Amino acid sequence: VIAVSTYINYANEFKSLTPKSNTTKNIFYDKNGKIFYESFGAAPPTEVTIEDVPQLVIDATLASEDSDFYQHGAIDPAGIARAALINFKNSKKNGLSRFSDLFNEEEYSQGGSTITQQLVKNIYLSNERSFDRKIKEVVYAYELERKHTKDDIFEMYLNNVYFGEQSLGIVNASKIYFGKELKQLSLAEVSMIVGLPAAPSRLSPISGDFEAAKERQKYVLSQMYYEEKITLEEAQKASATTLNLNAETERASIKYPYFVDYVKKELRDKLGEEAYESGGLKIHTTLDPGIQKITEQAATKHVATLKYRNVTNAAALVLDNKTGEVRAMLGGLDYNKSKVNVTTSKRQPGSSFKPIVYTAGLLNKYTASSRLWDGRVNFGGIPPYIPRNYDGGYRGYVTVRTALSNSLNVPAVEMTKLVGVEKVLKTAELLGIDSLDQNGEFGLSIGLGSGEVTLLDMVQAYSTFANLGERPNPTVINSVVDSSGSEIYLQPESKERVLDPKISYIMTSILSDNYARRLVFGSNSVLQLGNRPVAAKTGTTDSFADNWTMGYTPQYTVGVWVGNNDHSVMRSLPGLQGAAPIWNSVMKGIHQNLKIVNFEKPKGLEEVWISPYTGLPSTYKNKPNVLEYFLPGTAPDRNERFDYLRQFR
């Protein structure tokens, strides 16, 4: 009785419904509440009758979305069961398609929804995810099929489904993506377009994840082959065809395209694809236009001076340490040339990874005064692993402070060996570096930054040091308000204590010690900001493919990368001449009107004057000795000093 009553109520409700508009724009606001981007609403669809739809489009759509559309009713129980089975099998074989041997693709999860259900969701239902909404979907689908023929419903689907890039309906999609009429599209183009409604923003081959779009295209082709609509040769040829995309879209004029793309990705992850595509959202972001401008200008200006060193690109990210909010995100210098956001792409960090290695050491009872050997060492392996310092020289026994400040390679590998690769990886994960493959087979070279990580993760790790061991959650969205004025998302404050404040301060003390780093970097490098306390570290890979500078003040953490998107090598570009000048310019620019703040020193540290040559206590309380910081109970005592001196008597 209840079921019948519910059906009648929703069926009556359906009679008075009008299709919702998918043309409402989303508005992006910066941290000051000013609009910096509006995603233009989709233009009304250019309608096409089912008689004028090319057979290729019909075959591709039915094969990939609902192959039994003309045989089943509004709901397809067999399709739901089949989808559940496929999803189960995919989970068992890690996403490999039954056509993976043909196309080397990953299978898309099956939803089980019929074309009628998809149409209902697109034009009649809200974005809420609830049991009530699912019941409405079923009732509306039955009512739609009761009033319309299958051809009418299929025609409505093709004309009203959203394909991304402000294209409502497949005719508009054809023009926006390829600049062609629908009947002019090739198999390669059709198979790309018909797969887009599954996730229009993410799968857009123009502004989304192109690799994901290609995988979706391969899925469409595999389904067409499975349904015997095309041959294997046709499928393979279409998959290998280079698409001539019509990139002259509204996106070309976006002011901060990399940031906008990243915000959209975050929105899809947090709210779902439908919520964003339906429009009408007011998205309040963390972007500071002033800081973004400083970052862009510094990177563009400096890279222009490095052309003779084969440098074409730079990326940078600025994080507010107090809030974890991203104030600037520069994913590259030219969005029209490359839409790859380098701040979220994996690259080798080189020596900028060493603070993570030494943090692992501090977590395992080593100290800033622990001595490590800096000399020619064969660490074994085939071929033998014999790391060298950048300048080719060696300095004998050095303290951890000296080794890290001067970015000496051999001691970093030695520390990696002492604590173990696994503990280094766990420390990286602790600090927020999730992009490093925890299941990868890394050797001791991980201590020199041979593993690939993202700039965003590295900024998070360094910000953890700045926050005395509280790891921030980098965010680009503060809140989202929907078309009805309801706040549907509010970014929670999220800092997590992951590191002893004393260990964080010891690391900051080393990275901000300009006197200690003078041996390699000199006393007046671009890693200092006058009398403003700042901690910094450079990184350059052996092949000169990546050049980094990471650093922080109490207020901001800034990470900069310089290199080439295609991983081609730069011409012998040292760390201080690559990313560091950009980092210095950004740091100076964003702190120009800020008061000087010292790094907060936590309680409980032991302080002992230490000789940098012996790593032991000294009665001489001045340079070159250093006032070293220790966790309680880890400082060397005077007896160790006397034992050391006796050997010279």
Regions found by a protein language model. Give the residues of each.
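Flexible, acidic/glycine-enriched loop-and-adjacent beta/alpha segments
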Residues: 49-115, 169-171, 380
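Conserved catalytic neighborhood of penicillin-recognizing serine enzymes
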Residues: 89-129, 183, 249-255, 366-424, ...
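Short pre-catalytic segments that frame enzyme active sites
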Residues: 34-46, 172-176, 196-197, 201-206, ...
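Glycine-rich, acidic and aromatic/proline-enriched surface loops and short helix-turn segments
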Residues: 121, 125, 159-166, 183, ...
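A penicillin-recognizing enzyme superfamily signal
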Residues: 285-308, 318-320, 329, 334-345, ...
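Non-catalytic, structured segments within soluble enzyme domains
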Residues: 107-293, 297, 426-429, 433-438, ...
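Residue-level preference for non-acidic, small/hydrophobic
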Residues: 33, 61, 119, 153, ...
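N-terminal type II signal-anchor transmembrane helix
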Residues: 1-29, 68
